[in-house]
Amino acid sequence: MKRLTDGQKYMGSIREIAKLAGVSPASVSIYLNDKKTSRVGAATKQRIDQAVKDLHYHKNIFASTLSLQESRIIGIIIPSKMPLFSNEYTNSLLSGVQSQLSNEGYSLLFFPSDARTSDEIVEQQIQRSTGCDGYILFSTGFCTQAHIEKNIMELQKTDKPFVTLNIPEMEQARLQVLIRDLEICSGTKYLLGKGHRNIALMLGRDGGVHARKLYHDHRSLLEHANVAFDPDTVVFGDYQAQRAYEQAKDLLTSFPHLTALNCMSDIMAAGAILAAKDMGLRVPEDISIMGRNNSLHARLSTPAITTIDLHIEDAGKSAAHLLLAAIDGSAVSQKILIPGTLIERDTVSTIA
């Protein structure tokens, strides 16, 4: 068989590897499934390795594990139209999931989707990842409550264990990892405790299930403190610095009496800080700005951003650990709460 040049793209089969190496297909199969096997000689292994390299062969993981009734692969379901690695929050979650799975000998699988809505994206991702041992379902800003409920129903149809991550508490999901900035470390409550009474809120995406809950929590805390709530002081920054910059400028122009802005991500807080500076306002002397997530943006911003550390990577590790426990039968129904931690830095002042 003619050898392929480096620039050619081709995936060889086991029979083609055997032919090129001058060995039997059985020897190739035995060796590729167990590189340490003593049933194949060292010289034969070298010829197989060279043929694999020349043919650009990649093992079909699902097919090779069918006899074991397991793939040791976990499917990640992320209903988002954004590029997977463009979001630091998602990256931290995935880092936690992947590191825990890797420690346990499992691989991570993600299939992108060209669908338009979050529920259609999830349906496609499930179809393309058939053969996984289990799933981890993320929620993103594109998800409404109805979409999340439908996504959970789709996963239930697979008869495979799954864990929900970054999703509000739901009865339909038996295995959940809940990320919470509890009232004790809520940004709004912290600002109230610092003497602020004119507090605006910058949420992520309008219509998202997280935005709805955070809106309710913010309003409830203000009302409990006998502070009037004005819905016009709630804006959406879409988790983007530029959009947050624009929204913060409009907000601070329309409501010059504001003393604090509680942003639901550090990247939005960074955009808001830049807007305040461009308007000639000092942070935190003229306007206090709070973030959320304790990301790199919070640490590198000038001034450094006071924020809520949601321990995102730990949440990802917990989700992977819980799913593997479900796969081996030791977890049937469990909810793990990851509480946030207040990180005080330089963007919030105290009002006497």
Where in this protein do the model-derived segments appear?
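Short acidic/polar active-site loop segments enriched in Thr and Asp
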Residues: 24, 72, 133, 196-198, ...
